[in-house]
A protein has these predicted regions:
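Glycine-rich, highly charged phosphate/nucleotide-binding loops
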Residues: 91-100
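Catalytic or ion-coupling anion/metal-binding cores of large enzyme and transporter domains
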Residues: 1-50, 55-77, 81, 85-91, ...
Length: 556
């Protein structure tokens, strides 16, 4: 049986559609081919997405060469790094907005297949959610990583710039050095060369089968990237003609493969939100407990900036994603399908790259035997919370200290700027959860400042908000229930002792149950306005444990 598209140009009922597409420069005979929507997240104001202005042309060439017709449209691509402070309220909500806008556009225009061009923190998961909701033939392509900055003192990448803010705050570096870092560390286009959320989710898209292997870790300017773009353009036409849909490639087994790989490589804690959200769109049950059970089942064999000295290009040169997949091969489902062709097992059987054992360990001699995350429970977080243990120094796996409370990230940042944080403190940042923020802001700059100020070996952070994927140190996030919903974190007072034990997976507020209940009865929420879309988000957002979806996952 021959291929049949979603639109039939020869049908007179499609005359209006054909006429309007002719107005865009398409010929009628072009519309008789597979029409491939190119979902482009190019923007001038996000280095991880700027390269798509050029790459999209190579994808289109591949589509035309394989007998398809490319049709490009664009979606927003906000940069987490730029959206600090007030702007950060909008970042996590933007994930579902991106997914919804793509679903609307692709459904309205009836594209036969889709290529998703994405790189950064909320754009990759937003596009994955859209792909799952649409269930069309699809492939993904990421832009590749940013060039490192080579200086006399060493090699620097983006997290070093964030940490230098803290260094400058205590005069550990000069204004001249800080200015040089600010103007040079972000050395080129491409995703920030660290294993933050962008690269965690980009690599996840590779392992679950939608994106060419090493698309994320290779340099954005590599000739291999342009070849990949053409290959993706050609391959999507084949998948479309063969009727291979998202659900034929990405199954529950694929999802678990991707999660295991995240845990094996020291990924971002934000992966918990995004993988649970994607699973929800796919109709697969997954919450924090299920996420933890899967990630604890695999050893952590690698970790990258800022949790180690190795950046994304080091990862690529050390063997890349194929090498880390090979290291945990026995934990992966070999029958999971790859959109590029074949299965995970077949790909790993062919894998022959040289592997650097200093960077990529074996499963028998791992960095950690049970994943890179620790999910903690206790009276401060009855619903759980999460920390990236692979980014915590061993001496901080257990910490007990007095609480210093802040009802917003802004208040914390002011205290750190004024240098009022003391060694031993447990910094409690609340009313920054999904509803309380609203938007579940990440404590990106404060966490980096903590490192830059040398306090990450003596202070801990605890929040119902979240952290940048490029965070290191004892930074516990996603505390549930959140303060806005009356969670125990709302009742913590300055000076209360908090004990954190990562090995035992516990977090305990040294206050009696009776005292805690009495305090919670007198809590008053602070004024955290929710204008426009944030008001809708506050009313609609689901639990952090299930991924903070707000446009997806509800029963209709």
């Amino acid at each position: 049986m021959g291929w049949k598209g979603n639109r039939t140009p020869s049908n007179s009922q499609e005359g209006y559609y054909v006429g309007l597409m002719n107005a865009c420069g398409y010929r009628t005979k072009d519309l008789e081919k597979p029409v491939i929507g190119i979902v482009n997240s190019f923007t001038d104001v996000n280095p991880g997405h700027r390269a798509f202005k050029e790459l999209v042309g190579y994808v289109k060439e591949g589509v035309w060469a394989a007998g398809g017709t490319p049709a490009e449209f664009n979606v927003p691509a906000p940069c987490d790094g730029m959206a600090q402070g007030e702007g950060m309220h909008f970042i996590l909500p933007s994930r579902d907005l991106i997914a919804g806008s793509i679903q609307a556009m692709a459904s309205a225009h009836g594209f036969d297949g889709l290529v998703f061009l994405c790189s950064c923190d909320k754009i990759v998961p937003g596009m994955l959610m859209a792909a799952a909701a649409l269930n069309k033939p699809c492939m993904f392509l990421t832009a590749g990583s940013m060039l490192p900055y080579e200086a006399d003192e060493g090699t620097y990448v983006t997290p070093d710039l964030k940490e230098s803010i803290g260094q400058r705050n205590i005069d550990a570096i000069s204004e001249e050095t800080f200015t040089r870092f600010r103007e040079n560390i972000c050395f080129s286009c491409g995703t920030c060369s660290m294993y933050g959320t962008a690269n965690t989710m980009g690599v996840f898209a590779e392992v679950i089968g939608l994106c060419p292997i090493d698309s994320t870790t290779m340099l954005f300017c590599s000739s291999a990237k342009y070849k990949q773009a053409r290959d993706v353009g050609e391959r999507i036409v084949t998948l479309t003609k063969e009727g291979v849909r998202f659900s034929d490639v990405v199954t529950e087994a694929s999802l678990k493969n991707g999660l295991r790989h995240v845990a094996a490589t020291g990924g971002s804690t934000n992966a918990q939100l995004h993988i649970c959200a994607l699973a929800r769109v796919m109709g697969i049950p997954m919450d924090l407990a299920a996420f933890d059970a899967i990630q604890r089942d695999v050893p952590c064999v690698a970790k990258f900036k800022p949790s180690s000295k190795f950046n994304m290009y080091d990862y690529y040169k050390a063997g890349g994603v194929g090498a880390t997949m090979k290291a945990i091969e026995r934990y992966l489902d070999p029958d999971a399908r790859l959109a590029t062709g074949g299965t995970v097992g077949e790909f790993l059987a062919r894998f022959r790259r040289r592997v650097d054992p200093e960077i990529i360990h074996t499963a028998d001699e791992p960095l950690y035997p049970d994943g890179c995350f620790a999910v903690l429970h206790g009276n401060l977080a009855p619903g759980g919370c999460i920390v990236k243990k692979s980014g915590v120094v061993p001496e901080m796996f257990h910490h007990r200290g007095p609480a210093v409370c802040f009802d917003s990230e802004d208040a914390l940042r002011a205290a750190m700027t004024e240098k009022s944080v003391k060694p031993g403190d447990v910094l409690v940042i609340r009313y920054e959860g999904p509803k309380g923020g609203p938007g579940m802001r990440e404590m990106s700059i404060p966490a980096a400042m903590l490192v830059g100020m040398g306090l990450h070996t003596s202070c801990a952070m605890v929040t119902d908000g979240r952290y940048s994927g490029a965070t290191r140190g004892p930074c516990i996030g996603h505390v549930s229930p959140e303060a806005w919903d009356g969670g125990p974190i709302a009742a913590v007072r300055d000076g209360d002792m908090i004990e954190i034990d990562i090995d035992k997976h516990t977090i305990h507020l040294e206050v009696s149950d009776e005292e805690l209940a009495e305090r919670l009865g007198h809590i008053k929420r602070p004024a955290h306005p929710a204008p426009g879309v944030l008001g809708v988000y506050r009313k609609a957002v689901d639990s952090v444990n299930e991924g903070c979806t707000w446009l997806y996952g509800k029963e209709e």
